[in-house]
Amino acid sequence: MGVRNHRLLLLRHGETAWSTLGRHTGGTEVELTDTGRTQAELAGQLLGELELDDPIVICSPRRRTLDTAKLAGLTVNEVTGLLAEWDYGSYEGLTTPQIRESEPDWLVWTHGCPAGESVAQVNDRADSAVALALEHMSSRDVLFVSHGHFSRAVITRWVQLPLAEGSRFAMPTASIGICGFEHGVRQLAVLGLTGHPQPIAAG
């Protein structure tokens, strides 16, 4: 079996108090809520049903991702800042409506963040994450435990779209995305797989 027979899975961390409010959470350490902890456990049950092939688990260094991995019953093989969330810089802790009070058309996918990461920087980091996954996929499945925006960035670059198209993918808390190949073409096979109900976000 080779790289085209294996999968890249992405697991977003469970719910936090900031994620429920839509606050941009990059490097700030926030704990999972009780709901988030349950979500992580349910995600672990789902992963157990996916018949993964000797998966290597690579995790962001943030506490919320490490706790999600532990609650999901995963053994983390590598912790790396490569999978950290978008650095929101001056916008850390703010919601999109708050940011748009001063920059009406702002979208992280097209504008980036002052004093944080630009779109180009996240694009390059996502490409590096995809390359890392492909290195391991020659012999096994790969599971990234990461964050909402960065997981969407990886998915976008996996399917070789411009990073701005990441705005079109949803990644609810503790949800799973699965990337793979069909006839040699990189594809997104599954998105938003959860073991818990998720409301549809408005606007």
From Swiss-Prot:
It comes from Mycobacterium tuberculosis (strain ATCC 25618 / H37Rv). Homodimer. Disruption phenotype: Cells lacking both glpX and gpm2 grow as well as wild-type on glucose, but are unable to grow on any of the gluconeogenic carbon sources tested (glycerol, acetate and butyrate); the growth defect on gluconeogenic carbon sources is fully complemented by restoring expression of either GlpX or Gpm2. This double mutant lacks detectable FBPase activity and accumulates FBP. It is also severely attenuated in a mouse model of infection, as it fails to replicate in mouse lungs during the first 10 days of infection and begins to die thereafter. Belongs to the phosphoglycerate mutase family. Transmembrane segments: none annotated. One of its GO terms (biological process) is regulation of phosphorelay signal transduction system. The active site is at 13 (tele-phosphohistidine intermediate), 85 (proton donor/acceptor). Optimum pH is 5.4 for phosphatase activity using pNPP as the substrate. Phosphatase with a broad specificity. Can dephosphorylate a variety of substrates including phosphorylated sugars like fructose-6-phosphate (F6P). Is able to function in vivo as a fructose-1,6-bisphosphatase (FBPase) and to maintain gluconeogenesis when the classical FBPase GlpX is absent. Shows negligible phosphoglycerate mutase activity. Has no phosphatase activity against 3-phosphoglycerate, 2,3-bisphosphoglycerate, or hydrophobic substrates such as alpha-napthyl phosphate. InterPro entries: His_Pase_superF_clade-1, His_PPase_superfam, PGM_Phosphatase. It is an enzyme of class 3 (hydrolase). Keywords: Carbohydrate metabolism, Gluconeogenesis, Hydrolase. In contrast to classical FBPases, is resistant to inhibition by lithium. The record marks 147 as: Transition state stabilizer. Its EC number is 3.1.3.2, 3.1.3.11. This is Acid phosphatase. The gene is gpm2.
